[in-house]
Amino acid sequence: MSAKRILVLGGGFAGLWSAVGAARKLDELGHGPDAVKVALINRDAFHNIRVRNYEADLTPVRVPLDDVLGPVGVQRVEGEVAGIDLAGQAVTVTTARGLEILPYDRLVFALGSQLLRPDVPGLAEHAFDVDTYNGAARLNSHIQGLPRRPESPGLLTIVVVGAGLTGIEAATEMPGKLHTVLARAKRMTPFRVILADHNAWVGSDMGEPARPVIEAALTALEIETRLGTDIASISPSGMTLRSGEEVPAATVVWCAGTRANPLTRLFPVEADRFGRIPVDEFMRVQGVANVFAAGDVA
């Protein structure tokens, strides 16, 4: 009799804990890999502590998955999930070897969320983000290079778009980053950090009690706020508001919202406005046999 197979899609917090938790429970029950195999599929070999991508030192935010999965006997498959056959209980993965079809007896769908990028001209080409490790590393490299660039309007102005939790964390980290970079370059020029959002207040999802605390922290760091602001376009030299106002800035960081992985569309269920699929109290996808969902997709 062949071994049963648990497939976990995604190496974020939800996926990693699902895989490790399954391996631990199987060990407690005395079921070895000859009875049940656990495999985790992720696009690369790392777990990214995404909620810390705004930090200046990115070294601790990237953890090799094999260091966690190997000791508990979880197989790692490196590749991009291309499709899911819910009726046939199989996942199609694009790997370095080509397309591979992996069968499952139980599936954990934990592919997370991604930054929402609306159709704003120049956003894809000129804005930075902290949504991924590579995006955060690109932003850090850009900031470190600012002192070497010729003087221009907005050279030392950073605009963070999106005053939710990620945007607030990113914005409050920027003064320290800029101060360190400028001190290292012996160029203590004044700089600006602006937090912009289309809402009328910061931290709108965190409730009224949190607002005074957030506003006090922003004031202490001399971070400007531009609220009730809509972005019309982004260029290498800054951004244009819908009002027509030009805001010179060499650095625009987009943190305005996230949406569940688009593969949620493969499930025959009605997703919410963030693309998340409904689950029951045991994290089972409603109406879909042998499939669980966890994290930002559920």
Language-model-detected regions and their locations in the chain:
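Short glycine-rich anion-binding loops that position phosphate/pyrophosphate groups of nucleotides
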Residues: 14, 112-115, 171, 258-260
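Predominantly flavin-linked oxidoreductase catalytic cores and closely associated redox partners
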Residues: 125-221, 225-227
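FAD-binding core/adjacent interface of flavoenzyme oxidoreductases
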Residues: 2-3, 74-159, 186, 253
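Short glycine-enriched, charge-decorated loop/helix-capping segments at active-site entrances
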Residues: 52-57, 124-128, 210, 268-270
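Short hydrophobic core segments
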Residues: 9, 102-114, 231, 239, ...
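Beta1-alpha1 glycine-rich phosphate/pyrophosphate-binding loop at the start
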Residues: 2-78, 168-205, 253
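FAD-site-proximal beta/loop scaffold in flavoenzymes
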Residues: 125-150, 239-240, 246-298
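A conserved beta-strand/loop element that lines the FAD pocket in flavoprotein oxidoreductases
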Residues: 72-85, 219-234
